[in-house]
Amino acid sequence: MVLYSVVLAVIIFLPVPFLFKAEKVSLLAPQSFSMFVLGEAFMLIETKCCTELSLQFGNTWVVSSVVIFSFLTLSFLANLLVLRLDDRRLHSLMPAVYGLLTLVLLLNFFLSAQAIALPAAGAKAITTFISCLPVFFCGIIFSSHFKRATDPNMALAANLLGVTFGGLLENLCVVGGVKSLSLISLLLYLLSALPLLRKGAVSAEVADAKP
């Protein structure tokens, strides 16, 4: 069990040292690092949402269809919002988006239908909404990172590679339960913000250096 956990931890943090790699077109460049961990995190959120809703409503094609429809709708709305915002407003909005995503994922972890003082149908509706809501904020984060990418092909390659590793990370639910995927995906999404912080620091240094 210890070896299993160590290997999965290595998979999560493997791309971190490459954050400061200089080549901007490399698969290991900062922009690709963000896309990589975004792919990992989204895979975990998708797995958690599908699993929890299947446990609540039954593992049927109707439940799977509702989950897929919800994901596509929320992703579309997120992309629509990003398209309507200019780069400056989008950049200023990112701290709020990361903050709301953190709040929703923590609610996902701590909240359960049994803890809500409502009839079973209402409690399940609320937990379903909270389970799917992170996709909206995830879509905004993904689109904003992709919008900044200097090489879209490399960014998508890194994202797909992250999805592959995310498929491996799904096995962590064997150790910590399905709800633990919320915390792991939150960690990965916060890691995706590191290049943004680094970029902001570099921009501030350049601005200070100007006469």
Write out the residue ranges for each language-model feature.
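Alpha-helical transmembrane segments of multi-pass membrane proteins
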Residues: 1-211
